[in-house]
């Protein structure tokens, strides 16, 4: 029922990449582990068009998520402007945005901006980062991941898992 009607993922399946209990453990984990947020303030932005999908942002300060937002029903230009202004307001060091598909319009809109927030496109189908680097003793990154999206999601998974283990 919860999966079909409420949209909850089948969380404890062997096929789930990130377990909900790992996400729960990450909430305020920096406090539990005794460190403060530090480092760059990075705003991630996934844009959607005017359909049912949601646009979303996540603001992190170093490894600590400090804000999230989502909205629906707005065009790409509205969303790009909203995110850029928010990035300026929170003094983000950079905005990393989905730059393919609908995100191509974001790239064009960000180019028109004259503010100081750096904007970086993320091409999910792009090449693996540091393909020759060792992922494990017997595998290189290029042998483990098919593209940067798979690699990035696995990095997120590893952060959640390691945080859960630390807590």
For the regions a language model picked out, list residue spans one by one.
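ATPase catalytic-site recognition across NTP-hydrolyzing enzymes
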Residues: 1-45, 59
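Mg2+-dependent endonuclease catalytic cores in nucleic-acid-processing enzymes, primarily RNase H-like
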Residues: 63-167
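Short conserved beta-strand segments at catalytic cores or DNA/RNA-binding microdomains
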Residues: 56-62
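A general structural motif
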Residues: 47-50, 76
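Active-site-proximal helix/loop capping residues that flank conserved catalytic or ligand/cofactor
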Residues: 2-3, 55, 81, 154
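Short, flexible loop/turn motifs enriched in small residues
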Residues: 38, 49-56
């Amino acid at each position: 029922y919860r999966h079909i009607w409420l949209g909850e993922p089948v969380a404890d399946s062997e096929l789930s990449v990130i377990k909900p209990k790992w996400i729960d453990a990450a909430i305020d984990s920096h406090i539990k582990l005794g460190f403060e947020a530090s480092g760059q303030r990075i705003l991630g932005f996934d844009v959607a068009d005017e359909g049912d999908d949601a646009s979303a942002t996540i603001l992190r300060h170093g490894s600590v998520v400090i804000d999230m937002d989502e909205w629906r029903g707005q065009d790409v230009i509205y969303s790009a402007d909203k995110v850029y202004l928010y990035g300026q307001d929170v003094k983000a060091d950079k905005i990393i945005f989905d730059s393919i598909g609908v995100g191509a319009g974001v790239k064009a809109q960000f180019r028109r901006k004259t503010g100081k927030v750096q904007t970086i496109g993320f091409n999910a189908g792009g090449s693996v980062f540091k393909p020759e680097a060792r992922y494990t003793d017997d595998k290189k990154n290029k042998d483990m991941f098919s593209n940067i999206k798979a690699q990035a999601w696995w990095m997120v998974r590893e952060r959640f898992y390691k945080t859960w283990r630390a807590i």
